[in-house]
A protein has these predicted regions:
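Mature-chain termini and adjacent capping regions
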Residues: 1-147
Length: 147
């Protein structure tokens, strides 16, 4: 990244633009890109904002803001908000919010979630993506077929 600022009184580290990097977890390696990066030392939380892309082996996650929560050098969960797109094996899931629960190996999309596969669009109250088996589960689904 370009333009690093550390604020010792607020215990933050900020990088202004062109952020690229990766995180390694027991679940795999994830590359990320964003327009800005903020690390909150007290909370052990990372905030990526702007055009955020997080790429894993089985899926890509795109959004406006990504907050990574960690403890004991392990990622606990990731909150994605704003124009969330989860792309995996030809399926695209969209919503305004998604939470990646690392220990459960699942991502839950809420706030207007939709899923598109083979020109079939489904909506639901929430959509869960199981990373281990690559399957999507739609809670209270509604279907629309595109021609």
């Amino acid at each position: 990244g370009i333009g690093m600022t550390a604020d010792t009184s607020k215990e933050t580290v900020r990088i202004e633009k062109d952020i690229t990097g990766y995180i390694i977890t027991e679940k795999g390696r994830y590359r990320f890109q964003s327009d800005s990066f903020l690390y909150l030392l007290k909370d052990n939380t990372y905030v990526l904002a702007g055009r955020v892309v997080m790429k894993g082996e089985e899926m890509n996650l795109l959004c406006d803001k990504l907050v990574i929560f960690s403890s004991n050098n392990e990622v606990d969960k990731v909150d994605a908000t704003g124009k969330v797109r989860l792309i995996s094996k030809g399926t695209i899931a969209k919503s305004e919010k998604a939470v990646y629960h690392f220990k459960d190996d699942r991502i839950v999309l809420t706030e207007g979630p939709k899923i598109l596969k083979n020109n079939v669009e489904m909506e639901g109250e929430s959509i869960m993506y199981n990373i281990s088996n690559g399957k999507f589960f739609i809670n209270k689904p509604k279907t629309r077929i595109e021609k």
